[in-house]
Amino acid sequence: MKVISSIQALRDQLRGQNRVAFVPTMGNLHEGHLSLMRLARQHGDPVVASIFVNRLQFGPNEDFDKYPRTLQDDIEKLQSEGVYVLFAPTESDMYPVPQEYRVDPPHDLGDILEGEFRPGFFKGVCTVVMKLFCCVQPRVAVFGKKDYQQLMIVRRMAKQFALPVDIIPAETIRAEDGLALSSRNRYLGETERAEAPVLYKTLHEVRDTVLGGDGVDLLAVEADALARLQARGWKPDYVSIRKQDNLQPPTREEFAAGAPLVVLTAAKLGATRLIDNLEI
């Protein structure tokens, strides 16, 4: 596996490759990331991964400098998965001059849910993903469903800019007790780790209630889930039932007609903020 930091060197290495499958990451890789590499290999060849901790998507109260950087360990994991190239640019490689042009997602998708609680986050995500697509020029790119809103935003961005890349969704990888794998899990203490699977259990309870029959009050279901998490010591930002296609709340008519739904949540357990979702 070649490790490349320069955009020009990356383009030279990939010249003539027209079936590149790309997996962008911020490093600190775990089994969930590695599953994305395996899925990428099913859709293209060669597989290219990137590791770049993107300052643009960190808010003023989010510590960019403390984000875990484990490059050597990540390199070994990617080598074991047969990745062809790791693009690991420095900040000066990626942004040799200040990034004055940004990609701003539409408000109806970028300023809700995660976007409401992390203002500017998706603008930073879209900007770096667009730039990575320009650097790598993949035929397919794999994004995990764990970051469901990010997947929807990137998919819409690719479509509206007519980018020649297919966005492939990857199922969330979970621990045996249901906790979604995440780089943030390392911050959970022993007691918190034992409590953490309750978040996924709560999503299942929401789904079971929604599927339980006609006349379900979705707002009441959301409020009940929030209250139950709060009673256990969580600090939830949201539990929200949305349509899968555009992440808008379903109307009564859409719900009655069986519109595909997803329940999404973000909540703090101690100092660790976890996100998860479950399709209904």
UniProtKB/Swiss-Prot annotation:
Location in the cell: Cytoplasm
Active site: 33
Catalytic activity: (R)-pantoate + beta-alanine + ATP = (R)-pantothenate + AMP + diphosphate + H(+)
GO cellular component: cytosol
Positions of ATP binding: 26-33, 144-147, 173, 181-184
Binding site for (R)-pantoate: 57, 150
Entries under InterPro entries matching the protein: Cyt_trans-like (IPR004821), Pantoate_ligase (IPR003721), Pantoate_ligase_C (IPR042176), Rossmann-like_a/b/a_fold (IPR014729)
Main localization of the protein described in the UniProt heading: cytoplasm
Enzyme Commission numbers on file: 6.3.2.1
Binding site for beta-alanine: 57
GO molecular function terms noted in the UniProt entry: ATP binding; pantoate-beta-alanine ligase activity
Keywords: ATP-binding, Cytoplasm, Ligase, Nucleotide-binding, Pantothenate biosynthesis
Keyword ATP-binding: yes
Any GO BP annotation: pantothenate biosynthetic process
Pathway: Cofactor biosynthesis; (R)-pantothenate biosynthesis; (R)-pantothenate from (R)-pantoate and beta-alanine: step 1/1
Keyword Cell inner membrane assigned: no
Family: Belongs to the pantothenate synthetase family.
Database matches in PANTHER family: CYTIDYLATE KINASE/PANTOATE-BETA-ALANINE LIGASE, PANTOATE--BETA-ALANINE LIGASE
Other remarks on this protein: The reaction proceeds by a bi uni uni bi ping pong mechanism.
Subunit structure: Homodimer.
Cited function: Catalyzes the condensation of pantoate with beta-alanine in an ATP-dependent reaction via a pantoyl-adenylate intermediate.
Protein name (Swiss-Prot/TrEMBL): Pantothenate synthetase
Species in which this protein is naturally found: Cupriavidus metallidurans (strain ATCC 43123 / DSM 2839 / NBRC 102507 / CH34)
